[in-house]
Amino acid sequence: MPSLRIEQHESHRYPPRTWVNAQSADLTVAIAVDFTTKGELLTKRAAGAAFVALPLEGDPLDAARLLWKAVRQRDARTLNIAGNGICTMAKHGWSQERINTWVYQVIGKVHQHHPISFIRSGGQTGADIAGLVAAYALGIECLGLYPKRFLQRTIDNLDVRRSAEEIEAEIKSWAAGLV
């Protein structure tokens, strides 16, 4: 199985790890139902030109085509998967399992034609963790870089502390459900 690393940033705040993740990948992939949230605007600013937005409501095959064009244009082999958290996505009818499946289908299709060597994310619920789930299920090395103490925002918009072991077990369980 691929390497799955769960690490924490030195800051308790979300923005510092957003900047590190965006600047450490060839391309940042924002997966969202609302691209106007503070987090999405920060992610786009941090990624600069190395950014592609994939609307979650779209067909996974159409999203894969859009992502494939972006990775080919930049010859991107490392991705930062970002996007809305589950608290935003749930308001639009999305469960974490459904997001995981959608992201897995998109990345899996691109990976067949343009191999991805590494995926990183901020590990938040919703799109971020779905990127790690997809990477692990597809055999792609991956890293979740969380705020200090592995903060995650819940469906109720509350920040909770997790352990690296809890997060790793959750990712592996969801990935097993995809393959």
Model-found features: residue ranges?
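Acidic/glycine-enriched connector segments
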Residues: 1-121, 126-179
